[in-house]
Amino acid sequence: VREIALDTQAATTVAVVDDGRVIARAHNDSGRHHAESITPLVREALEAAGLPAQLADAGIDRVLVGTGPAPFTGLRAGLVSARVLAAVAGVPAYGVSALDVIARQGLDLLAPDARVYAIADARRRELYWGSYLAAGPDDVTLEGRLEVGDVSTLLGAMRAAPGLVVAGAPIPAHSADALAHADIGPQVSLDPAVMSRIVATRLSRGEEDRLHTNPLYLRRPDIQGQPTARL
């Protein structure tokens, strides 16, 4: 199975995944200009993998995309691009929350019965976070729902149900002091191969409804007048 995986939660990352293994990757570290950078990054990743730069000729079987949570503009660009890429290649597009991927990566490094709190920077001195348990070796179960709020809300949840914080990047500076005495687990970089594992597992269970490409904004966009419920 050959996949294009892309994520625009913060920077823009495109990877080619072949049978669960990342064989090429391209990224733009800027948190801006997501829409403009995706197509060149796709071509760069395909060429680095030794594949035709034209997506329709590259033997892609599916397109994977991170569904957030993330700010409106970058997330929308990623999801729209994933749907367009899938249409061009004539293949399905599947979405996975970046926090699901971060949680699974953390659990890969911990005891199988661990609870983790996957976090990401939500800006405005806030965090996106969710509490997770393992669902077998390749998937996760979200306890409750994904949240957005200041670090005190996360710490309150951790007092009620202890677990380890797993960050998908360095812990945001605005929350680092408050989390200094919390139980900190691994810090990871989002791995497209883990996204692929989650997708494969959910498809094998007939759980396509958990692979939708709807955006997880969690709050209203900074740009007023834009829709939040759907693209």
Where do the language-model regions lie?
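N-terminal beta-alpha supersecondary unit
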Residues: 1-69
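Surface "functional belts" at beta-alpha junctions
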Residues: 21-27, 33, 92-191, 210-211, ...
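Short, well-ordered alpha-helices that flank and scaffold nucleotide-derived cofactor binding pockets
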Residues: 40, 44, 83, 87, ...
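Phosphate-handling active-site elements
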Residues: 47-57, 86-96, 111-114
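DPxDG-like acidic metal-binding loop motif
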Residues: 64-93, 98
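Short, flexible loop segments at boundaries between secondary-structure elements
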Residues: 186-204
